[in-house]
Regions:
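Structural motif
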Residues: 78-81, 137-138, 165-168, 243, ...
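Acidic/His- and Gly-rich active-site-bordering loop/insert found
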Residues: 2-108, 113, 117-133
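Histidine/acidic-residue-rich, glycine-tolerant segments that coordinate divalent metal ions
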Residues: 68, 89-91, 96-107, 113-114, ...
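Metal-dependent amide/peptide-bond hydrolase catalytic core
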Residues: 2-5, 220-401
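Active-site pocket-shaping loop/turn-to-helix segments
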Residues: 33, 210-217, 273-278
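Divalent metal-coordination and catalytic microenvironments
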Residues: 30, 82, 112, 139, ...
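Active-site beta-loop-alpha junctions enriched in small/polar residues
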Residues: 35, 85-87, 144-146, 173, ...
Length: 401
């Protein structure tokens, strides 16, 4: 299908094709040279060089990596924030493509190279095309989306949300067909919380379990009872919540009941109410196991980014702009949610926000996110660029009223 811009941007069509080819090349360059969270020094240099090639020289860099550029069209007007995350993952790239990662053990396996390229492409298009927007525009290249603690709070501390009316973000998704865009209101990403537990007991001989506390058996009880809380006490339609235990370790010997056992799990949810309710019930289970079996259980939780909640009015405005200005050019769905986390949730906590999903699925066995064969087709870059360049000229502060 031939894609076009809204009538107001028709004169930009030919220029866009030239910019698009450069953005695709830039994405491949980023993919070849991935860097881990908080180490994106060369990535930041590459972003700055790309922007400078389009005459964008004022780059705000309050931290060692990442930063943002501002486009001021009207003094005193608020900003629209467009976020692109820039970090990669500690995964060996196993793909056979010309732009395969050249950094051993590091790969853009979550599509952040695409996000960065699209964000940079929007900035380049606005600059080169002389596009004027009703609100000011801030394009953020954010480091360290992946780890705990994540990069979004650092950017917020540095002032990236100053005078921002609302924020837009994106994420490629291999479960959504290429060319499809998800504009889903409400929660779209869960909060991820790491649960670390250390069981300590007297230990003993495996032939006399009645004389000691069997930590492996007690850990299995905790796992079963915890799953019971999640799947029998929570109405998933009201409180989406997931719990998965992923690691258990007790290295003593085949005939030794261990003195120490480590258990790790992941809790995912979308609301503070559900989180507090789970913590209360979970701590009660721990106390019961401790008192009944004369053991000690140390519980440490590491909370990741808050859940991402898309502002319903902003989502509706984006849908209406697309339907009005470029009907039939984008296939839009409105009911796609992910149990994964994203630190875009920190922005969504403070300003009305929308995290847009860009489909990249081209076959049934599409490699998933965070895998060594993950890749995104170059066509998604055009979809992302056209989407943001279509909606930004029509986004007004009034959409939230």
């Amino acid at each position: 299908m031939k894609r076009t811009f809204p009538e107001a941007l028709q004169s930009f069509q030919e220029q866009f094709e030239n910019i698009l080819s450069k953005v695709v090349e830039f994405r491949q360059e980023l993919h070849q040279h991935p860097e881990l969270s908080w180490q994106e020094v060369e990535t930041t240099r590459r972003i700055r060089r790309f922007l400078e090639s389009f005459g964008i020289t004022r780059f705000h860099q309050p931290t060692e990596t990442g930063g943002w550029v501002d486009f001021v069209f009207k003094e005193g007007a608020p900003f629209v924030l467009l976020r692109g995350d820039i970090d990669a993952l500690p995964i060996q790239d196993a793909k056979d493509v010309p732009y395969k990662s050249q950094n051993p053990g590091v790969c853009h396996a979550c599509g952040h190279d695409v996000h960065t390229a699209v964000a940079a492409g929007v900035a380049a298009a606005v600059q080169a095309g002389g596009i004027r927007l009703p609100l000011n525009l801030r394009v953020l290249f954010q480091p360290a989306e992946e780890p705990i603690p994540a990069g979004a709070p650092k950017m917020i501390e540095a002032g990236v949300l100053k005078d921002v009316a609302f924020a837009l973000g994106m994420h490629v998704d291999p479960r959504i067909p290429l060319g499809t865009i998800s504009l889903t209101p409400g929660w779209v990403n869960m909060q991820s919380i790491q649960l670390d537990l250390l069981f300590e007991g007297p230990g003993g001989h495996s032939s006399r379990p009645s004389e000691t506390a069997d930590l492996i058996w007690l850990a299995s009880r905790l796992i079963q009872d915890s799953y019971g809380i999640i799947y029998r006490e929570f109405d998933w339609m009201k409180f989406p919540i997931m719990l998965t235990f992923t690691e258990i370790e007790a290295k003593e010997g085949y005939n030794i009941i261990p003195k120490k056992l480590r258990l790790t799990g992941t809790l995912r949810l979308t609301s503070t109410q559900a989180k507090n309710r789970f913590y209360m019930r979970f701590r009660n289970l721990l106390q019961e196991l401790e008192s009944e079996n004369h053991i000690m259980i140390r519980f440490i939780k590491k909370e990741g980014a808050p859940p991402v909640h898309n502002n319903p009015r902003l989502i509706r405005a984006l849908r209406e702009i697309i339907q009005r200005e470029t009907p039939d050019q984008f296939h839009v769905i409105d009911n796609y949610r992910s149990p994964g986390g994203d630190d875009f949730g920190f922005y969504a906590q403070q300003v009305p926000s929308a995290l847009v999903r860009l489909g990249i699925q081209t076959r049934d066995d599409q490699p998933g996110l965070h895998t060594q064969y993950f890749d995104a087709p170059p066509e998604v870059i055009e979809v992302g660029l056209r989407f943001f360049l279509t909606v930004l000229p029509f986004l007004q502060q009034e959409v939230l009223q």
